[in-house]
């Protein structure tokens, strides 16, 4: 079964190189898996992960966290901002984005902080970070 156009439908899937190449009623093939209970998903998004880099790589790194997420079926994760330095301005966000570009094996969208250093006093520079953030949070402080 596949979820197509808002409904579940019985169908055949052609998967080439790990990607769904066709959905429909297909001719017989030597390379067919029967109804073996396999479930195929296009990929999940986890909107609340703690990759902890930069600053706390002894707890988790972008490399290990994204590999674990990929193994669990995630193709995108949104990383919480409890880092050091906290992504509360463009410069600090760029440090995190550089590490993401270098080490992530899946798409990572970071959160920026709501307040400077997640202290709950002064608003962060959200305007200059918004284009590259999933949103803003002071989670994990």
What are these regions, as identified by a protein language model?
Residues 1-29:
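N-terminal metal-binding scaffold of metallo-dependent hydrolase/deaminase domains
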Residues 29, 40, 116-118:
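A short acidic, often aromatic-flanked loop/helix-cap motif at beta-alpha or helix-coil junctions
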Residues 36-103:
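Metal-associated gating/positioning segment near the N- to mid-region
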């Amino acid at each position: 079964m596949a979820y197509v156009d808002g409904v579940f439908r019985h169908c055949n899937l052609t998967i080439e190189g790990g990607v769904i190449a066709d959905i429909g009623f297909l001719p017989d093939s030597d390379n067919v898996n029967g109804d073996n209970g396999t479930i195929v998903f296009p990929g999940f998004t986890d909107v609340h992960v703690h990759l902890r880099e930069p600053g706390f790589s002894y707890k988790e790194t972008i490399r290990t966290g994204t590999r674990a997420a990929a193994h669990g079926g995630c193709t995108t994760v949104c990383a919480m901002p409890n880092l050091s330095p906290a992504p509360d301005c463009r410069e600090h966000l760029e440090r995190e984005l550089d590490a993401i570009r270098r080490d992530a094996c899946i798409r990572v969208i970071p959160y920026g902080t709501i307040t400077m250093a997640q202290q709950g006093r002064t608003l962060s520079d959200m305007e200059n970070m918004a284009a590259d953030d999933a949103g803003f949070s002071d989670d994990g402080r």
